[in-house]
Amino acid sequence: MEPTVQDDPQRSLERIRSELWDPTVCLERVAPGVTPHLDLSSLGLHSVRESALGAYADLGRGELDRAVATLRAVLTHQYDAPGRPWDGTFRVTAEQADPPGADAVEWLHYDPNWRQFLGAILAVTVLDHRAVLPADVVDGVSAAVVRCAIGEPEERIPEWYTNPNLLHAWVDAHAGLFTGDDTLVERGRRRAQQTIDRFEHASDVDEYNSPTYDGVDLLAAALWVVHPPTPHFAAWGRSLLDGLCDRISTLVDTQLACVCGPYWRAYGIALDRYVSLLGLWLHVAGVERVLPAAVDPGTDHVHDLWFLPLVTRLASSVTPPWQLRPVDSERRYVQRFDDVVAISILRPGRNVGWATGPVPEFAADQYVPFVAHCVRRDGTVAHLGVRPGEDVELVDAGEVTRDAFRVRLKSSGRPVTVGIDGVELQVEANRLVDRDGVVVVESASAKTSRWTPMPSGWSLHAADPELLITLTPHA
């Protein structure tokens, strides 16, 4: 692989934050790259979560005054609405309107998971920096963490929803420690055990192989180890780190700087095209090209870069047990979840992964059941991901030959739109062909379907579409 000059992500973060900091409200503006293909920066919005993470970063650099001002501003954006489903969560932006009462729609008018993210960020801020914070800020932050805990409806987070369960278990237990409430501590311990039991039953997390949410799970596990509210958390956190790092180490191709698919939840296919939480962890571990070479406010998903100071601090304390190594011979990895099977194959110069079974109902637009990465002649990497569209119920994928793969998408005969992520693919004779010819995508219904360009690649509209994908790596 050709070497790529990588900007220092920490310096990039400091530069971006200095550009986005708004001293008039003591918060950070929303960056253009937060929502890919939709620049919201002209609206003058201010991000609450990233501002809290910025305060944590400032405390680590000794910038106490700005951190204190930011924390005081952040605390004003927590909802205090007992009995409402948004009680205890935070506005996503400072300008977000209050939820419209009984007509409020979850994820549209409020983000319930901001209880978990802001609760964890604020709790670790107090735990790491209590000694330098003014008493009113310590009290205010601690009270906000407690409100995050008690505002969470008991049954809102399904058992399979890994990342908020991991975070909220820790937030609950620490809220109990902050107040001396043993009931909250025990509630957090029960949620943690429930999540660990599922992890041990399946030998992995439900949000399997997700470049962003694996990073959140690593962060939560590290918090359990570094600041365990009970001894159980330390042991369970270490078990989570061991299991996650083992699987991720197997699926990471350090030469191609990618994670072999399939992905249960992904915002992108190529780690060097957007910022992911897992990319931050791998960067801290010394893996190259797992973040964009240059990160600026317009980089896709740039807001996840704000986690870098916290990831760096946690990684230095827990030393994740990575076993990262080049792919010099074939690796195969199989993961089963009831009626879904995920298969990953890594060979020198290319890797491919697919899942067979029902499409998840939650976050189906982030599901990528077929993923391929393949090296070109010039050393760059071609990336391909197949995303089932709405109404796709089942994916049936597998090997045809060593270099050819078939992907069938079942939709009860209804026409569906399938997304093909791959910005460097071009249409040739109604096939999608990578610029170096290392990836070719053909439709079995080529005569009755057409490829349509979209920002991240192409889409195909057909009934029960079937794709034949051929890889020809130049190793």
Task: Please state what every model-predicted region is.
Residues 2-117, 121-123, 130, 138-153, ...:
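Ser/Thr/Asn(+Pro)-rich, low-complexity disordered segments
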Residues 120-124, 139-323:
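Extracellular polysaccharide-recognition and catalytic grooves
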